[in-house]
């Protein structure tokens, strides 16, 4: 038997957790995610957005939303750009662990759409220019995973 999630979201409800830090990037990721959800038939009224101060706060809010069982998927969007200190490494590691743990405590898929880049140019490329829009990619993953879990 094969299981495969469909890419139609007409009956899905999706939450997006987005960081306000580096909002010149995260706003593009959010636009890409919302546009993609709508293009895949998720009703705009079924898309809720929670804003958090920075990437570090994303996992807690994502976990809380996923545990509510009101959503078929939760998308996390943020942007961490390497600076001149080790802060980048700590934030990236803890955010990735936190999002992963959120998947462990609920049956709602929590999708990792957080950019971790070496510089601003890489972030811009992944927010809608050369390398596509990682927010849009996260939205496709959310739809597929939500439908796959319904099928299993």
Swiss-Prot record:
Q: Name one GO molecular function term.
A: 6,7-dimethyl-8-ribityllumazine synthase activity
Asked if the Swiss-Prot or TrEMBL record annotates the protein with the keyword Zinc, the reply is: no
Q: Which GO terms describe its biological process?
A: riboflavin biosynthetic process
Q: Where does (2S)-2-hydroxy-3-oxobutyl phosphate bind?
A: 84-85, 126
Organism domain of life: Bacteria
One of the record's GO cellular component terms: riboflavin synthase complex
**Positions that bind 5-amino-6-(D-ribitylamino)uracil:** 21, 55-57, 79-81, 112
- Cross-referenced Pfam families, in alphabetical order? DMRL_synthase
- Quaternary data: Forms an icosahedral capsid composed of 60 subunits, arranged as a dodecamer of pentamers.
Catalytic residues (positions): 87 (proton donor)
| Protein name, entry field | 6,7-dimethyl-8-ribityllumazine synthase
- Gene name linked to the record: ribH
The UniProt keywords, alphabetically, are: Riboflavin biosynthesis, Transferase
Pathway listed: Cofactor biosynthesis; riboflavin biosynthesis; riboflavin from 2-hydroxy-3-oxobutyl phosphate and 5-amino-6-(D-ribitylamino)uracil: step 1/2
- EC number(s) on file: 2.5.1.78
InterPro entries the UniProt entry points to: LS (IPR034964), LS/RS (IPR002180), LS/RS_sf (IPR036467)
Q: Which species?
A: Staphylococcus saprophyticus subsp. saprophyticus (strain ATCC 15305 / DSM 20229 / NCIMB 8711 / NCTC 7292 / S-41)
SUPFAM superfamilies this protein is in? Answer: Lumazine synthase
UniProt-listed Gene3D superfamilies = Lumazine/riboflavin synthase (3.40.50.960)
What does this gene product do?
Answer: Catalyzes the formation of 6,7-dimethyl-8-ribityllumazine by condensation of 5-amino-6-(D-ribitylamino)uracil with 3,4-dihydroxy-2-butanone 4-phosphate. This is the penultimate step in the biosynthesis of riboflavin.
> What does the similarity note say?
Belongs to the DMRL synthase family.
**Catalytic reaction annotation:** (2S)-2-hydroxy-3-oxobutyl phosphate + 5-amino-6-(D-ribitylamino)uracil = 6,7-dimethyl-8-(1-D-ribityl)lumazine + phosphate + 2 H2O + H(+)
């Amino acid at each position: 038997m094969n299981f495969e999630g469909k890419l139609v979201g007409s009956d899905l409800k999706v939450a997006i957790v987005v960081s306000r830090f580096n909002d010149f990037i995260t706003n593009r990721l959010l636009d890409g995610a919302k546009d993609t959800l709508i293009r895949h038939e998720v009703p705009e009224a079924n898309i809720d957005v929670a804003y958090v101060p920075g990437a570090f706060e994303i996992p807690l809010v994502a976990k809380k939303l996923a545990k509510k069982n009101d959503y078929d998927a939760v998308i996390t969007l943020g942007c961490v750009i390497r600076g001149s200190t080790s802060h980048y490494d700590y934030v990236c590691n803890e955010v990735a662990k936190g999002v992963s743990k959120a998947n462990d405590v609920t049956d709602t898929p929590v999708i990792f759409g957080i950019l971790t880049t070496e510089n601003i140019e890489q972030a811009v490329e992944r927010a809608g220019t050369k390398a596509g829009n990682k927010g849009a990619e996260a939205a496709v993953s959310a739809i597929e995973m939500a439908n796959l879990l319904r099928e299993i």
